[in-house]
């Protein structure tokens, strides 16, 4: 068993807490935990048996920045499709680890489709529904044996919507005998943690190395998630997957995920994240990837694309031009980032500012690598540009947007130069 260490004291400066030391888990070409950068993952919502549709969506998620993608494997057709999906992705030059999401019948599917077991980079196992009664231990062991045979990592993911009822009943019974019983919420959290951690220790007993195990214990409530992961992090050294089980739709889902995950990440807890957004009608599935990246970037965990600071607007900024320019700049740097990642590494750390008036515009622009202070209502029709804190040029006229974009591109080419060798 892992001996929990004392929770570290918060840093005195503005940095995040030190990362929690965990096992490093190799998932395909990605390493989760062990001090490596927090990994962004996502999940498809296609019928996995629809090979063309699944390949298309995995490719979209990968291009958006997802570093691992999970797919439902719930029947023989979806299990048989996995090797073909991997093959087609590789033909497109896409090497992204695919995770098989198993519930109820994973042991049967991998027995029937060993090529699926080989093609997947990781198996997700839910200890709450891997089996029931006397079959539970046997079916869990079968899945772990597949992971050992094919040298695959697993995520043992407990979920409050599919909690191990036998364990929950046991803990409720134990709680009733306490001199001071816990409230129901605390018992539920304990059941989630015990389900995940005890299952992981059982997997180790069966022969799966600790560095092949990732844990999660998901709920939908922000405070509950924070409490569960703080407690679980203190009890084990397994890599942890963070995420609300159902974050919700639109801004609610984004805010809930940010509220929960940012607290844990700031405390050094979490090795991979997924933002479980409910897509709005017509919205791309890639939104969850973008939100995950922005969450990690705004909390200082990673850098994916230049960070654009923009004025929110007020009565001094009756023109919408600064809003339009902020959107143009954001879209431009996101579109250029795949190219810059290869030719201009480090450009993702660049900061940009698009401000709308003289009050905070010049000051905020000086804090950025490149900033522009547009004129507010009644101000002179000119826009000073600041580069690394120094005013360099003043833009005027109808081509401000094009000229500012050109200045950004020039700065990238001049500042972020790939070193030979």
From Swiss-Prot:
Classification via Gene3D superfamilies: Dihydropteroate synthase-like (3.20.20.20), Sulfite Reductase Hemoprotein, domain 1 (3.30.413.10)
Chain segments annotated as transmembrane: none
One protein family per Pfam: GcpE
InterPro entries: Dihydropteroate_synth-like_sf (IPR011005), IspG_bac (IPR016425), IspG_bac-typ (IPR004588), NO2/SO3_Rdtase_4Fe4S_sf (IPR045854)
Cofactor(s) this protein cannot do without: [4Fe-4S] cluster
Pathway: Isoprenoid biosynthesis; isopentenyl diphosphate biosynthesis via DXP pathway; isopentenyl diphosphate from 1-deoxy-D-xylulose 5-phosphate: step 5/6
Cofactor: how bound: Binds 1 [4Fe-4S] cluster.
Enzyme Commission code: 1.17.7.3
Catalytic activity: (2E)-4-hydroxy-3-methylbut-2-enyl diphosphate + oxidized [flavodoxin] + H2O + 2 H(+) = 2-C-methyl-D-erythritol 2,4-cyclic diphosphate + reduced [flavodoxin]
Binding positions ([4Fe-4S] cluster): 311, 314, 357, 364
Keyword Iron attributed: yes
Gene Ontology molecular functions: 4 iron, 4 sulfur cluster binding; 4-hydroxy-3-methylbut-2-en-1-yl diphosphate synthase activity (ferredoxin); 4-hydroxy-3-methylbut-2-enyl-diphosphate synthase activity (flavodoxin); iron ion binding
Record-linked NCBIfam families: ispG_gcpE, PRK00366.1
Assigned protein family: Belongs to the IspG family.
Name under which the protein is recorded: 4-hydroxy-3-methylbut-2-en-1-yl diphosphate synthase (flavodoxin)
Gene field: ispG
């Amino acid at each position: 068993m892992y001996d929990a260490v004392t929770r570290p004291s918060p840093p005195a400066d503005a940095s995040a807490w030190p990362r929690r030391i965990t096992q490093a888990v190799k998932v395909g070409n990605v390493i989760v935990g062990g001090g490596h950068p927090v990994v962004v993952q996502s999940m498809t919502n296609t019928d996995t048996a629809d090979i063309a549709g699944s390949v298309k969506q995995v490719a979209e998620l990968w291009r958006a920045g997802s570093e691992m993608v999970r797919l439902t494997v719930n029947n023989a057709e979806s299990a048989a499709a996995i090797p073909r999906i991997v093959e087609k992705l590789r033909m497109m030059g896409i090497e992204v680890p695919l995770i098989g999401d198993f519930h109820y019948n994973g042991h049967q599917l991998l027995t029937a489709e060993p090529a699926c077991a080989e093609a997947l980079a990781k198996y997700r196992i839910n200890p709450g529904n891997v089996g029931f009664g006397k079959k539970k231990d046997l079916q869990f062991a079968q899945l772990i044996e597949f992971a050992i045979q094919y040298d695959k990592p697993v995520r043992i993911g407990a979920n409050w919507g599919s909690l191990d009822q036998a364990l929950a009943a046991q803990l409720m019974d134990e709680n009733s005998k306490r001199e001071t019983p816990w409230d129901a919420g605390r018992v539920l959290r304990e059941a989630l943690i015990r389900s995940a951690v005890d299952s992981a220790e059982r997997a180790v007993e069966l022969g799966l190395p600790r560095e092949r195990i990732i844990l999660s214990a998901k709920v939908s409530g922000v405070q509950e998630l924070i409490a569960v992961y703080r407690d679980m992090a203190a009890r084990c050294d397994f890599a942890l997957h963070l995420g609300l089980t159902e974050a919700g739709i639109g801004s609610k889902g984004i805010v809930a995920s940010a509220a929960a995950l940012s607290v844990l990440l700031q405390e050094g807890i979490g090795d991979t994240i997924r933002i479980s957004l409910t897509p709005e009608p017509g919205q791309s599935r890639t939104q969850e990837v973008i939100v995950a990246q922005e969450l990690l970037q705004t909390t200082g965990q990673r850098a994916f694309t230049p960070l654009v600071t923009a004025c929110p607007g007020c009565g001094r900024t009756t023109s919408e031009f600064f809003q339009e320019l902020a959107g143009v700049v954001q879209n431009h740097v996101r579109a250029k980032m795949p190219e810059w990642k290869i030719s201009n590494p480090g450009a993702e750390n660049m900061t940009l500012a698009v401000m709308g008036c003289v009050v905070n515009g010049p000051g905020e622009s000086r804090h950025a690598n490149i900033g522009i202070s547009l004129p507010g209502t009644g101000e002179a029709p000119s826009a000073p540009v600041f580069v690394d804190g120094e005013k360099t040029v003043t833009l005027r006229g109808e081509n401000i947007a094009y000229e500012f974009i050109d200045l950004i591109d020039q700065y990238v080419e001049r500042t972020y130069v790939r070193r030979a060798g």
